[in-house]
């Protein structure tokens, strides 16, 4: 499925809902979606959150 990335392990996508980037400050966690090796941005984050 994948070669590398925060949502890839052993050439497989990590399960949807797996945290791939922990929240910092008042930010929110980012989660794998089970379909990509990248760590998608949490859609519930504010517009100006990093």
Swiss-Prot record:
Any one annotated GO CC term: extracellular region
GO molecular function: toxin activity
PROSITE patterns found in the cross-reference section: DISINTEGRIN_1 (PS00427), DISINTEGRIN_2 (PS50214)
Disulfide linkage: 2-11, 7-32, 8-37, 20-39
Tissue and organ expression note: Expressed by the venom gland.
Motif (Cell attachment site): 24-26
Cell compartments where the protein resides: Secreted
Ranges for domain Disintegrin: 1-47
InterPro entries for the chain: Disintegrin_CS, Disintegrin_dom, Disintegrin_dom_sf
Keywords carried by this UniProt record: Cell adhesion impairing toxin, Disulfide bond, Hemostasis impairing toxin, Platelet aggregation inhibiting toxin, Secreted, Toxin
Family: Belongs to the venom metalloproteinase (M12B) family. P-II subfamily. P-IIa sub-subfamily.
Role of this protein: Inhibits ADP-induced human platelet aggregation.
Subunit field text: Monomer (disintegrin).
Note: The disintegrin belongs to the short disintegrin subfamily.
Name of the protein: Disintegrin pyramidin-A
Organism expressing this protein natively: Echis pyramidum leakeyi
Lineage: Eukaryota, Metazoa, Chordata, Craniata, Vertebrata
């Amino acid at each position: 499925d994948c070669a590398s990335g925060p949502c890839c392990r052993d050439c497989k996508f990590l399960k949807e809902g797996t945290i791939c980037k922990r929240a910092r400050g008042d930010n929110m966690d980012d989660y794998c979606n089970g379909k990509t090796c990248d760590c998608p941005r949490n859609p519930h984050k504010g517009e100006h959150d990093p």
